[in-house]
UniProtKB/Swiss-Prot annotation:
Keywords: Cytoplasm, Initiation factor, Protein biosynthesis, RNA-binding, Translation regulation. This is Probable eukaryotic translation initiation factor 4 gamma homolog. The lineage of its organism: Eukaryota, Fungi, Fungi incertae sedis, Microsporidia, Nosematidae. The keyword Calcium does not apply. GO terms for biological process: regulation of translation. Residues 66-79 have a biased composition (Acidic residues). GO terms for cellular component: eukaryotic translation initiation factor 4F complex.
């Protein structure tokens, strides 16, 4: 029997260590944005500097008595007295000799000057401190202050007098005496003086940009209404300033993707009202701000060819591994920045579409171009579009176009890398959960039992039934055509779009008949208050394109006027809409006739 080798069993023990403290970075649109919006001014407490005190060698502070009680030796006092006596005698002898030959009145001033000059010469010839040795230090300092004083009436001494003090004394400066506070007229604030606003000297563009940037930096879900009102209150003067703010919002939406939806809400709120003073005189429907947001976002997509250089770097072209790694990092950094910029613009356009700020017409041309380009990056951009706006396209009855893009992505997903392939599969899986449009009308007669239709005995009855069915089909097509005109008016962007829509009047009048089409058109305006807001002004502005005479229009209005009493039961606003339409039409006709006469 062969001896079996015993096997060693290893037991792996894993112990979970819970970290004591973790740091997480959280960016929530409901929280305050402290980093990007710091306080205007930060008040810091300043420590008062310590007082400088003169001390004796033993460490005790010097007092005023110590300054005045400094005495000299007896020998110095004797030499000082001898010098004073000798100086006085020499001066007296010189004065007597000069006065003998002159009168007292003429020589009085000269004598005083000679005495002062002789005293100064004697003092300078000897030691400079000998003549002042016996004087107190307090007196010496006061004499020095008198030499430099401005007003002779103000005494300078250590102890303040009744005269108002305008400066500190020597004792107060040396901290021998507590300082007495005094007021200077130079430091008083003039109440009547108008304060100078230094911001007025800045350029208006800089102040507006600073205010707008400051408001956008504070943007969150909680304060978005207040920030929109603050932005509307900005006094924008030129079109260039409005364009700069539009580019600023696009830049911030690209670099701050977590707040992109909020920036789209700001654009939607400022779409029509955010105009500069220069734009008010031009009378344009589209604002420069909104046009700049669209053009700058679309320009990012138009300039997108490749996010970065996709060629593979050859290691043999570099000297060492360090240079190769540095070149590879630069390539990946450039790729990341371009990808971030492109997808940021896609997010902004998708959010604008989801908020009904723009329509599919604004981005459909660029999507059609992407469908004709076979590129991994383009496929990823299309997937991003469908992921963001696919459900909204279904709700807006654009499901055919969304399904076409989804089928294109499904067909080409196997051509690219696994990352793109799995991303497209995730997007297509989300399609199952998209909401479908729900019809608002309900079938009120669903519970009733349908009866069999009676047989048509005669050919005349059969012919009448065919004519009735044809008229019903024509009326349905008429309503569908009018509804398409209304949808086109909702999506109209400029006056040029409305001119193109007005061409439908000619096509519809030729196919359905002029009278039948416009009678149905006006009945839709009267019975539907929501549609009348767009359809009625549109007919008034483009009445010349309808090929209707005023007499024909008068007959159509009279027919609807007879039905108003019946329509008021189901449509209470029909009479109001009818009167507004007639008044607006008459005013428009009269204004044009007056203009032609003038």
């Amino acid at each position: 029997m062969v001896n079996e080798v015993p096997t060693l069993k290893k037991k792996i023990i894993f112990k979970y260590f819970k970290p004591l403290l973790t740091f997480t970075k959280k960016e929530d649109p409901y929280e305050l944005r402290v980093k990007s919006a710091p306080p205007l001014n930060i008040i810091e407490e300043r420590k008062e500097p310590k007082k400088f005190v003169l001390c004796k060698p033993d460490g005790t502070p010097i007092t005023l008595d110590d300054l005045s009680d400094i005495s000299d030796s007896e020998e110095e006092e004797d030499t000082k007295l001898d010098m004073k006596d000798s100086i006085k005698e020499d001066v007296k002898d010189s004065i007597k000799e000069d006065v003998k030959d002159s009168s007292k009145e003429d020589v009085k001033d000269d004598v005083i000057e000679d005495v002062k000059g002789s005293i100064n010469e004697e003092i300078n010839s000897t030691c400079g401190t000998c003549s002042f040795i016996n004087l107190k230090r307090e007196k010496i300092l006061n004499e020095l202050l008198e030499m430099y004083r401005v007003e002779e009436s103000v005494p300078y001494s250590f102890v303040p007098t009744n005269v108002p003090q305008i400066m500190y004394s020597v004792g107060e400066i040396l901290n021998c005496i507590n300082k007495i506070p005094f007021t200077l007229k130079l430091l008083k604030k003039d109440v009547n003086k108008i304060p100078v606003n230094y911001k007025e000297f800045k350029i208006n563009k800089e102040t507006i940009i600073e205010k707008a940037t400051f408001e956008l930096n504070k943007l969150t879900n909680t304060n978005i209404k207040r920030i929109i009102t603050n932005l509307k209150n900005l006094n924008i003067e030129t079109i260039q300033q409005a364009k700069y703010l539009g580019n600023l919002i696009v830049f911030k939406a690209i670099n701050e993707p977590q707040y992109c939806n909020l920036y789209a809400m700001v654009v939607g709120a400022l779409k029509k009202d955010f105009k500069s003073k220069e734009e008010l005189g031009l009378h344009k429907k589209q604002t420069a701000f909104f046009g700049t947001v669209l053009t700058s976002a679309m320009k990012v997509l138009e300039e997108k060819v490749e996010w970065a250089d996709t060629k593979v770097l050859d290691k043999n072209l570099y000297k060492n591994a360090f240079e190769y790694e540095r070149a590879f990092e630069e390539q990946e950094t450039e790729r990341y920045l371009r990808k971030k910029k492109t997808l940021g613009a896609v997010n902004l356009l998708c959010d604008l579409y989801n908020l009904d700020v723009i329509t599919l017409k604004h981005i459909q041309s660029r999507l059609n171009e992407f469908l004709n380009i076979e590129n991994e990056e383009v496929v990823e951009v299309l997937g991003k579009f469908i992921e963001k706006i696919g459900e909204k396209m279904y709700l807006n009855d654009k499901s055919d176009y969304a399904n076409m893009i989804c089928s294109y992505l499904d067909a080409c997903k196997n051509k690219y890398s696994n990352r793109v392939k799995f991303y497209i599969m995730d997007v297509l899986d989300k399609k199952k959960n998209w909401k479908k449009p729900v019809s608002k009308t309900e079938n009120l007669f669903s519970s009733l039992i349908m009866e069999d239709e009676p047989a048509l005995d005669t050919p005349y009855q059969y012919q009448e039934q065919v004519i009735a069915n044809e008229e019903e089909e024509d009326s349905l097509e008429l309503l569908k055509t009018i509804d398409n005109i209304y949808q086109d008016l909702k999506d109209a962007y400029d006056e040029e779009d409305e001119i193109m829509i007005a061409d439908n009047f000619k096509i519809a009048s030729n196919t359905f008949g002029k009278i039948s089409f416009f009678s149905t058109y006006f009945s839709e305006c009267i019975t539907n208050s929501r549609k009348s807001k767009l359809l009625v002004p549109f007919v008034i502005n483009f009445f010349n394109e309808t090929n209707l005479n005023e007499s024909e229009l008068f007959d159509i209005i009279n027919k609807h006027k007879e039905k108003l009493n019946e329509l008021k039961i189901d449509f209470p606003l029909s009479q109001k809409i009818m009167s507004l339409y007639v008044i607006n039409f008459v005013v428009d006709r009269l204004s044009k006739k007056i203009h032609m006469i003038n």
